[in-house]
A protein has these predicted regions:
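N-terminal transmembrane-helix/juxtamembrane module of multi-pass inner/ER membrane proteins
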Residues: 2-10, 15-102
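Interfacial helix-loop-helix junctions of multi-pass membrane proteins
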Residues: 141-151, 191-196, 230-256
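Aromatic-anchored segments of alpha-helical transmembrane domains
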Residues: 38-42, 130-138, 226-239
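Membrane-proximal cytoplasmic C-terminal regulatory module of class A 7TM GPCRs
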Residues: 259-279
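Interfacial segments of alpha-helical transmembrane regions
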Residues: 100, 104-140, 146-160
Length: 279
């Protein structure tokens, strides 16, 4: 008589096991993100072509008029209220030059390791937001406030003689931070007229979406609310962006969300049709 054979049901991965990233897949993700950012920087630099300067300043003059119509042309007032506090402006310069990358990259890593079920969606949303920003840089080159000349370029008397009169202080150059647009490296790679839309503000909104959707603590919700506001203040007080640049950043994020959801609904319909056809 043969001995009975114990039959065991095949093991079914739990939810956590099913979504856990495979070993070394993170290397591929690093390659995807770094490669995409390299393409982004290359295309953004190509947008800084010959003849763009006059176009960028013309657009800046138009934007100032638009902000005047909307009663939001207050960037100079805000900067003048804080520019005397050198330590504070230097802190804002460091904030502007670092957290834009550090927090965004940190949240990507956190999503990959702790909220992997939503990582791909959020990664694609960030990539689409960044790609839409490139379209804005090509279509609407814009001189930021720190480069904007006042008085319609009519020389006016000042303590150092007749000058064109600058509305804004280039805080990265005058006060300092971790880097400056006048450094050799920045001059070689930076497109100073890639201001509309503000990707600083757009990425900050992306971070807020991640924290609101996937954060499980009240502190993360509070951070999600205040981080975009603090970023808006930083880009304005350092004279790197206009208020309408931030509005443009919000537009590309909302557009990316809409496109992403449209793509998801289309995919859901296609999967449903395949299930019905196979039934």
């Amino acid at each position: 008589m043969t001995s009975p054979v114990d039959l065991e049901a095949p093991s079914v991965p739990t939810d956590g096991e099913a979504i856990r990233p495979k070993k070394y897949r993170w290397l591929r993700e690093i390659g995807v993100v770094v490669g995409f950012y390299y393409v982004y920087e290359t295309v953004r630099s190509l947008a800084d072509h010959a003849g763009i300067t006059n176009h960028a300043y013309s657009n800046a003059r138009r934007l100032v008029v638009w902000e005047g119509w909307l009663h939001i042309f207050h960037e100079q007032v805000i900067q003048q209220a804080f520019v005397g506090a050198t330590w504070f402006i230097r802190m804002m310069n460091i904030y502007y030059g670092t957290l834009h990358f550090v927090i965004t990259a940190g949240l990507l890593v956190w999503m990959y390791r702790k909220r992997h079920e939503g990582y791909k969606e959020m990664r694609n949303l960030l990539g689409l937001t960044t790609a839409l920003a490139l379209i804005g840089y090509w279509l609407f080159p814009l001189a930021p406030p720190r480069l904007y000349k006042c008085n319609n370029n009519i020389p006016v008397p000042g303590p150092d003689g007749f000058t064109l009169g600058k509305c804004f202080v280039d805080t990265l150059d005058k006060v300092g931070g971790l880097w400056s647009y006048h450094s050799p490296i920045a001059k070689a790679v930076a497109n100073q007229y890639a201001a509309m839309p503000s990707l600083h503000f757009g990425w900050a909104l992306w971070c807020a979406i991640v924290l609101f959707r996937f954060g499980r603590h009240r502190a993360t919700r509070v951070a999600a609310f205040f981080y975009p506001l603090l970023t808006l203040f930083a880009i304005v007080v350092t004279a790197n962006h206009w208020f309408l640049d931030a509005a443009g950043g919000a537009v590309i994020v909302l557009s990316a969300v809409w496109i992403t959801r449209l793509h998801q609904r289309r995919g859901d319909r296609q999967r449903l049709q395949r299930v019905r056809s196979s039934a």
